[in-house]
Each structure stands twice: as C-alpha cells, then as structure tokens.
Amino acid sequence: MKERGLLIVLSGPSGVGKGTVRQAIFSQEDTKFEYSISVTTRSPREGEVNGVDYFFKTRDEFEQMIADNKLLEWAEYVGNYYGTPVDYVEQTLQDGKDVFLEIEVQGALQVRNAFPEGLFIFLAPPSLSELKNRIVTRGTETDALIENRMKAAKAEIEMMDAYDYVVENDNVETACDKIKAIVLAEHLKRERVAPRYKKMLEVE
C-alpha cells in the first residue's frame, strides 16, 4: 500500500512573504511538493496569473463552491474570500505525494481540524514594523486597509501556538531551507517510518 503523502500548510500574516517563500521553494529543482492553488475573490496583484498564483473568482462563484462543499477550508479576510479546493488535495495525498498549501491563518486552523496529522508552519515577520513596511512597499493597499491588515496580523501572530513550527522570514533563502529541513524531518519521524520497516520484517 502506498504511503500517504504529507500535507504541508504554510501560513502567516499578510505581508510576511508567504507567496515569495512559496515561489522560491518551487523554483528549486529538488522540490518534490505538489502545490495546491487557492481560490480567492480578491483582485489579482501585478504579475499574478489566474490558475498559477490563485484561481480568481467572483463572490457569487465562490459562494457556490461553498454551497457545493468543494472547499477544504475557506475564510473571509479583509473583505475577500480565500479557500482551498478539497478534491485535488485529497487525491494527491492518496497518491502518496506531498501537498503544499499557502493559506491564511483562519483557513489553516480549519485545515488543522480536518487534517490533524498535517504539518503546520507559521511564517513570522522579523518585527511588526518590518511587516508594515512590506505591506506599504507593495503599493496595493490604502492606508485604511493597511491598518486593518496590521490589526489582523497582531491577532494572527497570537495564534502561532496552534502550529507545529515557526519560521522567521528575515531572509527568503534561509526560510526556504528551514521549511524543507522541517519537511524532511517530518518524513523521518518514527510514526511514519516504523510501520514500513515492521512490514518488511514480517515479509522476511
């Protein structure tokens, strides 16, 4: 029987660099994760591509997906919906492949309830002032929205106790290395490895 894949969930406050870290991880040739693309109702940022960075939907389309139980998790964050398509995630895990989710904190907590065996990593900013600077530098939010995001960020940072690991994103390359090391260690845990060896001993 094929070993079930590992669900890797990366989340953290807006502006912490989740997308940048995810892109850096998937640009490396030795990356073996499958990326689960999220669905959102927010407008695309400059350079974002539909079906690559997100599936961009209208609110009506998103709410229909909720009604049809097509989302593993979903949340409304600063006026926009975000969610994860459930079918792709479950099938990929059954195929023995690791699935990488980059989602908002609210969504991650929902996934934790559905997949307690998953690996949950909180990406943290070096400081709140640096986090605000990153959001401002994006140039995509109004002053009011920036303040809303900062309030949300403070609340989200307080939720990091719900995660297995915390990685500070002070340097993208270093953060990527830490995340990949965490995933490797998780695959080598006794709970995942021992059953395979015990079965091998039974055969011999």
Swiss-Prot record:
Entry binding sites for ATP? G12, P13, S14, G15, V16, G17, K18, G19
Reaction equations catalysed: GMP + ATP = GDP + ADP
| Record-linked SMART domains | GuKc
Q: Which domain of life is it from?
A: Bacteria
Guanylate kinase-like domain boundaries:
5-184
Which keywords, in A-to-Z order, does the entry hold? ATP-binding, Cytoplasm, Kinase, Nucleotide-binding, Transferase
List GO terms (cellular component aspect): cytosol
* Cell compartments where the protein resides: Cytoplasm
Nucleotide-binding as a keyword of this entry, yes or no, is yes
Look up the EC number in the record and give it.
2.7.4.8
GO MF, one annotated term? ATP binding
- EC class, as a word, reads transferase
Task: Name the family the entry cites.
Answer: Belongs to the guanylate kinase family.
Record NCBIfam families:
guanyl_kin (TIGR03263)
Query: What is the protein's known function?
Result: Essential for recycling GMP and indirectly, cGMP.
PANTHER family (UniProt xref): GUANYLATE KINASE (PTHR23117:SF13), GUANYLATE KINASE-RELATED (PTHR23117)
* Protein name per its UniProtKB record: Guanylate kinase
Q: What is the source species?
A: Bacillus subtilis (strain 168)
